[in-house]
From Swiss-Prot:
GO terms, molecular function: methyltransferase activity
NCBIfam families, per database record: mthyl_TIGR00027 (TIGR00027)
Entry protein name: Putative S-adenosyl-L-methionine-dependent methyltransferase MAV_4573
Chain's role: Exhibits S-adenosyl-L-methionine-dependent methyltransferase activity.
Swiss-Prot/TrEMBL keywords: Methyltransferase, S-adenosyl-L-methionine, Transferase
UniProt GO BP: methylation
SUPFAM superfamilies given in the database record: S-adenosyl-L-methionine-dependent methyltransferases
Annotated residues for binding of S-adenosyl-L-methionine: 129, 158-159
Domain of life: Bacteria
Enzyme Commission no: 2.1.1.-
Coiled coil residues, start to end: none
InterPro entries linked: Ppm1/Ppm2/Tcmp (IPR007213), SAM-dependent_MTases_sf (IPR029063), SAM_mthyl_Trfase_ML2640-like (IPR011610)
Annotated Gene3D superfamilies: Vaccinia Virus protein VP39
Amino acid sequence: MTVPNDDTWGPATSVGTTATMAAAARAIATRDGVINDPFAEPLVRAVGVNFLTRWAIGELVASDVDVEGSPWGLAQMPAAIAARTRYFDEFYADAAAAGIRQAVILASGLDTRAYRLDWPAGMTVFEIDQPAVVEFKTTALARLAAEPKADLRTVAVDLRDDWSTALATAGLDSSKPTAWIAEGLFGYLAPEAQDRLLDAVTALSTPGSRLGSEAVPDTADMDPHAARQRMRAATAKWRDHGFELDVDVISFAGERHDVGAYLQALGWTTVATPMAELLADQGLPAIARADDDRQTMNGVTYYTSTLGTGRQR
């Protein structure tokens, strides 16, 4: 278990640290020419978590801190994060080509798509995240003289609060199709909160809207103590280098609905792509297999969903 319901964070604490870790992985993938996120490394530097900064700029290498052969470590992350970055970049390109002119990035973290993608004229991008995260990124990118390539509207609200009203106040037109993404989010939501979010997205969407999501597996039958011990062992050297990240404390394990099936019941059509397939399709290295892949990024599945006319209310 879990993040307390009243917990808040910035990019250097709690759940926010995972966004900075993902940005560090994007910085490495950018340097390797796999993706192009020129803002990733500067943002990681600005956050100031020494371990992640050193990793992002190449002063710390995965072999220094990973447990050999572990499927959960820094070595696996740049390819996995690059694959999902490409996936959601292409999702937005396809949505824009289909005429959608509203994009919502849920739990946007250090995402810079509003600044780096070539959006069509008339595109509005909404970013939703914790107030401290929104303030940090907005300020850091302004200091870099970065300019958004769309009409960017930040919505500083916790997704556990009334974000739907805040989004509408920011100008979302729910009578028009919207392209939503939930990237690196569901594992940090309680199962019932995941359902509420999908219900809310559906309520705010008109037919033709699209949702790109990264889903984590049901782990109801997994021994939580054993899972914690595996994670602690895999990240032991991180702590030796001064970086403490208890993923099991900030994430939610246990029983949860299958995202694809849940969305289909709400009137969406879905196409699923498991992580292993996504990596293979993009010519990226596979993640080492574990005895139980549900605790690694091999357990992640990506969904592209489109809302039909027969949605459930």
